[in-house]
Structures are given as structure tokens and as C-alpha cells.
Amino acid sequence: MKTTFLDFEQQIAELESKIEELRFVQDESSVDISDEIKMLAEKSLQLTKDVYANLTPWQVSQVARHPQRPYTLDYVGALFTDFHELHGDRTFADDQSIIGGLARFENQPCMVIGHQKGRDTKERALRNFGMSRPEGYRKAMRLMRLAEKFGIPVFTFVDTPGAFPGIDAEERNQSEAIGRNLYVQAELEVPIIATIIGEGGSGGALAIAMGDAVLMLQNSTYSVISPEGCASILWKTADKASEAAEQLGLTAQRLKALGLIDKIVAEPIGGAHRDYDGMMSNMRKALAESLKTFDGMKVDALLDRRHERLMSYGKFKEITAKS
């Protein structure tokens, strides 16, 4: 698959294009230019390292949305075995923007749930671009309850711009569906390991992300609103999205510093979309380490730990103004 380069990667794109041209010439000619190709490849690699070591929050947002980034089904196919997808919320419909089912991770039975955006136009329409309706969240809740009944851990993968804001979703009580999921996750008697793999957009993300362990990919985002949405509200124009991204504190590094997530999962150089195998290797290790934390933990201890974790969010200190 040919890599799609973002606006801030144009220098990298030019180098990669030159390398491809030279490789074509090498194949069609008896002249050995392998040394020049190697030199350009090393230059491209170093430039990529330099660019990705200094990404702004807005650039991180762009990487998080990259169309070639691994989605939930990519992780399911690479990390889990015996996946059996389960459909429907048993109330209204089967929302294809959230997929889920029984599987095995490292030979241990588990439940996997995650957003799926879609690769092409047809699939994106089917998946509603990863924006879930109430039936999607109710399906996720049903699968969580099923995992609880079987006594198996839940893995969730979050990648959504946010819950679908359409009239039909509101008519079927979108806010109640999200709120009910938060309630269920707070009391679920099995471990929940949530990973933000791309966009973590507001309540639409939180509805399947209240984990006992919350992981974030290095170039993913997690925020109450998108930078464009924030800019449109504060400055009445989406042109201020870059400034909004700075103020939202939506990067993994910022959220880790605030104690809102537990672990940052490193991405390969140039982002997860540049090296699927490397990303899957890093993810497997991170999930295995997180799951091991809860080995043998009794239900009461698990729930106490989760409660303490949730109550630790949003603490503040009052300071009396000097007269």
C-alpha cells in the first residue's frame, strides 16, 4: 500500500518519491545506484524521526485521523484468535460502527469491542465513519454483560470522532445509552482494558473507555471536543483549530501527565500506519502487561480499585485569595 503523506510530511514525501524513482531506474538499468538509494533512505528515516519527535498537538490530531492507520479489525486480526463477531443490541438494530465478539488473547478467552471507521467510501457509509448511534452503545453494553457472565476480561479499542449527533440518534436516547454504559462499566465485575487507537472523541469514546487500565497510542488523541469544533465555538471559525488543539491538552503525553491514562503505547517511526507489524508487536506487549496486572485479583479488590481510580479524576485545590 502506497503511503499517504500529510501536509507537514511533504519533505519526507519528496524524498520517498525520489527513492522510488531511483529504485525504478535501478531495476531498468545496469548502473549500480544502490549506495545513493541507501543514502536517501537513511536521510528520509532521520527526517521522519526529527519531524515526529516535534509534532504539535494539531499535527498529532492529523496523524490520529490518518486514513491508513490500523483500525479495530486490524488489531483483532493480528492480536486475537478465534474471533466470533456478535451482532445487535436486542432492542433496535445492529450498529456497524461498533464491532465486538468473543475471542482469545494469548490463549485466554476474552471479549473484544471497538469502533470501526471503514477504509473506502462504501464501508465508511456502512460504519457511519465510526460515529455510533444508541444501538451501537447498547450492543457494547450487552457484550460487556455477557463477558461478566462468562467471567472473562474485556478489551476495548476506541477510535471515533464522537457519538453520532443525528436526529434519529437523539430520538432513540443517545445520551441515555452513553450514560448507561458508564454506569455498567463502573460496576462490571471483570477487568476492562481500554486503548485509544486513533481519535477519542468525547462521550462517544468514553462510552467504551472507562477501563481499569487505559492505554493510548503515542499519536492518538482523547478530548471532550475536536479542535475544529472547539475553534468554531470559541472563535467562530475552524481556522483556529491548531490553536484549539494546543489548549485542549488532547495528546497522550499531556493526559499521562494528568493521570488520566496509564500507559502510552509507542508507535513505529512515522506513525502506526507506516509499520503495521511493528505496531502490532508493541500493542501485544502492552495489552499482555496490562492484563497481567489483574491476574488473580478478586472482584471486590477490582471494583475498589476502579472506584478509587474514577474518584481521583478532576481533583482540585482551593486557594484563598490574599486580601
From Swiss-Prot:
Its Enzyme Commission number(s) read 2.1.3.15
* Molecular function terms, GO-annotated: acetyl-CoA carboxylase activity; ATP binding; carboxyl- or carbamoyltransferase activity
Report disulfide bridges, numbered on this chain: none
One Pfam family recorded for the sequence: ACCA
Q: Which InterPro entries match?
A: Acetyl_CoA_COase_a_su, ClpP/crotonase-like_dom_sf, COA_CT_C
Top-level lineage group: Bacteria
Catalysed reaction(s) here are:
N(6)-carboxybiotinyl-L-lysyl-[protein] + acetyl-CoA = N(6)-biotinyl-L-lysyl-[protein] + malonyl-CoA
Biological process according to GO:
fatty acid biosynthetic process; malonyl-CoA biosynthetic process
Q: Where is the CoA carboxyltransferase C-terminal domain?
A: 40-293
- Fetch the SUPFAM superfamilies from UniProt: ClpP/crotonase (SSF52096)
Alphabetical UniProt keywords = ATP-binding, Cytoplasm, Fatty acid biosynthesis, Fatty acid metabolism, Lipid biosynthesis, Lipid metabolism, Nucleotide-binding, Transferase
Report the subcellular localization: Cytoplasm
Presence of keyword Transmembrane = no
Q: Which GO terms describe its cellular component?
A: acetyl-CoA carboxylase complex
- The keyword Cell wall biogenesis/degradation is annotated on this UniProt entry: no
Q: Pathway, per Swiss-Prot/TrEMBL?
A: Lipid metabolism; malonyl-CoA biosynthesis; malonyl-CoA from acetyl-CoA: step 1/1
Enzyme class (EC, first level): transferase
* Assembly and binders: Acetyl-CoA carboxylase is a heterohexamer composed of biotin carboxyl carrier protein (AccB), biotin carboxylase (AccC) and two subunits each of ACCase subunit alpha (AccA) and ACCase subunit beta (AccD).
Q: Which NCBIfam families match?
A: accA, AccA_sub, PRK05724.1
Q: What does this protein do?
A: Component of the acetyl coenzyme A carboxylase (ACC) complex. First, biotin carboxylase catalyzes the carboxylation of biotin on its carrier protein (BCCP) and then the CO(2) group is transferred by the carboxyltransferase to acetyl-CoA to form malonyl-CoA.
Q: Which family does it belong to?
A: Belongs to the AccA family.
Full protein name: Acetyl-coenzyme A carboxylase carboxyl transferase subunit alpha
- Lineage of the organism: Bacteria, Pseudomonadati, Pseudomonadota, Betaproteobacteria, Burkholderiales
